[in-house]
């Protein structure tokens, strides 16, 4: 069954999850990034309890059509969105610009939203040199410093309070659809849900185009990116049934099959061979969308 690490861990605590490490050779294991295989190694002893099939990271998705109008009027550029600080400053400019377009005071619009606040906290803290928590021998230790916590606050919650950031729909792509925001950071797989129109009202809508940019990082920091995604978990059974499951998963993650799945779903390939732009371009699959 498909599961994230937290679900797999809960089932593993019941003694129901099979260790798949014995069904793969060292060469087969080397086909995957090490961090993908160790995600389910809960006891840090080389077990493989989550077989990677789909991964994602985060990107910035932009309503480029309406952005171009704003950029032409204010001189804003894509480079302004490359850092967290630049994003916040640009969001402030966008709020002021939209506010000035009407006679109603303080009715500016938000520029930006995030799908996963937790990812921002974890990744941004690491960029700032602080791992929020560590776990050793089953014990968690919180390491977040006051300075880092304040910087995270000032670049996320403060813009929310000021109306520069927003999050009203279930997902930020919903807020793009209604025109509540122009941009959001979310999973690369969410590209398939990016709307082709903004529905301003029941009677007014307009077409938009998508621009994809890197997830902004803190200025001067070492860039850090999240890797996430559900994998396949095999419940304990007979050796023959477990081996059959692994045989299928090996087939599913062969480069040609993994590329086809990744292109069709918007997820990242999970093997080194499939995670290659030349191989993807040579696959013959339609990459225009």
Walk through the language-model features, giving the residues of each.
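Short glycine- and hydrophobic/aromatic-rich loop-to-beta-strand nucleating segment
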Residues: 58-62, 232-233
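Glycine-centered hinge/linker elements that transmit conformational signals in sensory
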Residues: 88-95, 135-169
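Hinge/lid segment of periplasmic solute-binding proteins
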Residues: 4-59, 125, 205-216, 281-288
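Extracytoplasmic/periplasmic solute-binding protein
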Residues: 43-53, 58, 85-141
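Short helix-loop capping/hinge motifs at secondary-structure junctions, enriched
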Residues: 66-77, 238-245
